[in-house]
């Protein structure tokens, strides 16, 4: 049976993650407060951010930048700004 969480990003109940996907206290916070739907949104933004900014995940500064963007996106309600990207009009 899947567990439900009140998602901090989407501000609604949703299916929780199956296991902790990120290490440490931040990982526990994500596991306890972020839904699968919001995590999937973050993964999409994360991929775009890594590609557009040409981030190297071996570089500690780049990892820290990505972690900061992740916290801002998931918990602060801020969207990821990617220079030069124009979202498709709906």
From Swiss-Prot:
One of its GO terms (biological process) is cellular response to oxidative stress. It comes from the Bacteria. GO terms for molecular function: iron ion binding. The keyword Iron applies. It holds the Pfam family Iron_traffic. Belongs to the Fe(2+)-trafficking protein family. Could be a mediator in iron transactions between iron acquisition and iron-requiring processes, such as synthesis and/or repair of Fe-S clusters in biosynthetic enzymes. This is Probable Fe(2+)-trafficking protein. It comes from Vibrio parahaemolyticus serotype O3:K6 (strain RIMD 2210633). The lineage of its organism: Bacteria, Pseudomonadati, Pseudomonadota, Gammaproteobacteria, Vibrionales.
């Amino acid at each position: 049976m899947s567990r439900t969480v009140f998602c901090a990003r989407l501000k609604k109940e949703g299916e929780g993650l199956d296991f902790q996907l990120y290490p440490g206290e931040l990982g526990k916070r994500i596991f306890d407060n972020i839904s699968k739907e919001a995590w999937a949104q973050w993964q999409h933004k994360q991929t775009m951010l890594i590609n557009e900014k040409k981030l190297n995940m071996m570089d500690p500064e780049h990892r820290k930048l990505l972690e900061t963007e992740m916290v801002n996106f998931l918990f602060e309600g801020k969207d990821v700004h990617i220079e030069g990207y124009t979202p498709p009009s709906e």
